[in-house]
Amino acid sequence: MSMPMDVSKKSFKPAKTQKSKTISNDYIKGLQTKHFLLYNVIPTIGTITAIALLWWYPISSVEIGLLIGMWALSMIGMSVGLHRYFAHRAFKTSQTMSVILAILGCMGAQGPVVSWVAVHRRHHEYSDLPGDPHSPNPELLGEGIFGTLRGLWHAHVGWLTNHEYPNPMYYAPELMRDKTISKINRNYVVWIVLGLLIPTILGGIIHGSWIGAVEGLLWGGFVRMFVVDNSILSINSFSHAFGTHPFDSKDQSRNNIWVAIPTFGESWQNNHHTFENSAAIGLKWWQIDLGYCLIWGLEKLGLVWDVKLPTAKMIEAKKLA
């Protein structure tokens, strides 16, 4: 059943014995650069290649289906899994469902479960202040149009190779102790490869050719990764710079309708930063929130429970005059 959420409660309990909130050394910086090249640059090249090949190999319903299907699976993993479940504990579920959500989240290739959660929890702790890994706040990077552009660039992509790594022992201690999640974490690359193999194999089987397999890899693999990646990154940049700010969230988060569908409803950032533990990010009937639609359906099926939602009184109390 759904339950009122405690808006004052943090999403996690920091480890009392762990003093350092961040880790910064040459090894970590090297990993950040490698991750960026492998899972941001290569999908971008793959997307350009897929578009260039349209002249010789027009896209078919198969490629469109693989793109949409793999995008949906990745976004379920990232929006419902990594974000609302693992980072904010907006609902409870079984170990089997948590494993499925974790693997699907890893297919999005934005970091292992523990790393993703640690970065996100630090973002909420320092939202749009010094210490936020990916704020576009121009006050942190300079005023004027150039400061704004630098802020947007930093929040969207610049931070990926240049941020202090949040210490998982501080920000995600319960996940570090979870043996199942730790095993999924260690096999992060396996899940990314699986996310590439599925559309490759399906494309080859459906088309009955190697060309079909390559098309499946390009559209269901690399283009899908590019779309998912930039959709999520747009939340960091555009949804903390443009849009409405109806609630007193103590930061610069904005509600942005333009990327609501591709982000599964994650773009209602002012709502989210005001009620961070809520399973629903879209709080009005017209605020599209595919992630919560799925959670609602899973709750009806008994697959998730204790779904946290703000009451009407809580929402009214946080509205700006």
Swiss-Prot record:
Disulfide feature: none
Task: Give me any GO biological process, just one.
Answer: fatty acid metabolic process
Q: Where on this chain is Histidine box-3 (motif)?
A: 269-273
CDD domains for this protein: Delta9-FADS-like
Q: Write down the required cofactor(s).
A: Fe(2+)
Which catalytic reaction applies to this protein? Answer: 5-hexenoyl-[ACP] + 2 reduced [2Fe-2S]-[ferredoxin] + O2 + 2 H(+) = 5-hexynoyl-[ACP] + 2 oxidized [2Fe-2S]-[ferredoxin] + 2 H2O; hexanoyl-[ACP] + 2 reduced [2Fe-2S]-[ferredoxin] + O2 + 2 H(+) = 5-hexenoyl-[ACP] + 2 oxidized [2Fe-2S]-[ferredoxin] + 2 H2O
GO CC: one term?
membrane
Motif mapping: Histidine box-1: 83-88
Subcellular locations according to the entry: Membrane
The EC number(s) this enzyme carries: 1.14.19.40
Keywords from UniProt, A to Z, are:
Fatty acid metabolism, Iron, Lipid metabolism, Membrane, Oxidoreductase, Transmembrane, Transmembrane helix
- What this chain does, per the record? Desaturase involved in the biosynthesis of jamaicamides, which show sodium channel blocking activity and fish toxicity. Catalyzes the conversion of 5-hexenoyl loaded onto the acyl carrier protein JamC (5-hexenoyl-JamC) to 5-hexynoyl-JamC. Can also catalyze the conversion of hexanoyl-JamC to 5-hexenoyl-JamC, but it cannot use free 5-hexenoic acid, 5-hexenoyl-CoA, 2-hexenoyl-JamC, 3-hexenoyl-JamC or 4-hexenoyl-JamC. Is specific for C(6) chains, and cannot use 4-pentenoyl-JamC, 6-heptenoyl-JamC or 7-octenoyl-JamC as substrate.
Q: What is this protein called?
A: Hex-5-enoyl-[acyl-carrier protein] acetylenase
Which organism does this sequence originate in? Answer: Moorena producens (strain JHB)
Q: What gene makes this protein? A: jamB
